[in-house]
Amino acid sequence: MKLTCVLVVLLLVLPFGDLIGVCSTPEGSCVHNGCICQNAPCCHPSGCNWVNVCPGFLWDRS
């Protein structure tokens, strides 16, 4: 039973791997306010997360 629970949790968490800083898609570009990304993930790999939001200090590099 415990193994089943662990497997279910892993299946739920794996699609959101970028929550822990794992970016699997190419860098995106941020809107110029430095917050919401136009493409996933955010403009800087350390800023990517599953809702495609950059912290305010990770500004658009362009």
UniProtKB/Swiss-Prot annotation:
Q: GO CC annotation: what is one? A: extracellular region
Q: Span of the secretion signal?
A: 1-19
Q: Where in the cell is it found?
A: Secreted
**Is Mitochondrion one of the keywords?**
no
Q: Which UniProt keywords apply?
A: Disulfide bond, Neurotoxin, Secreted, Signal, Toxin
Processing and modification events after translation: Contains 4 disulfide bonds.
Record keyword Disulfide bond present? yes
Q: Which GO molecular-function terms appear in the entry?
A: toxin activity
Q: Give the tissue specificity.
A: Expressed by the venom duct.
Family the entry assigns: Belongs to the conotoxin O1 superfamily.
Domain free text: The cysteine framework is XII (C-C-C-C-CC-C-C).
Q: What does this protein do?
A: Probable neurotoxin.
- The entry's protein name is Conotoxin Cal12.2e
UniProt organism field: Californiconus californicus
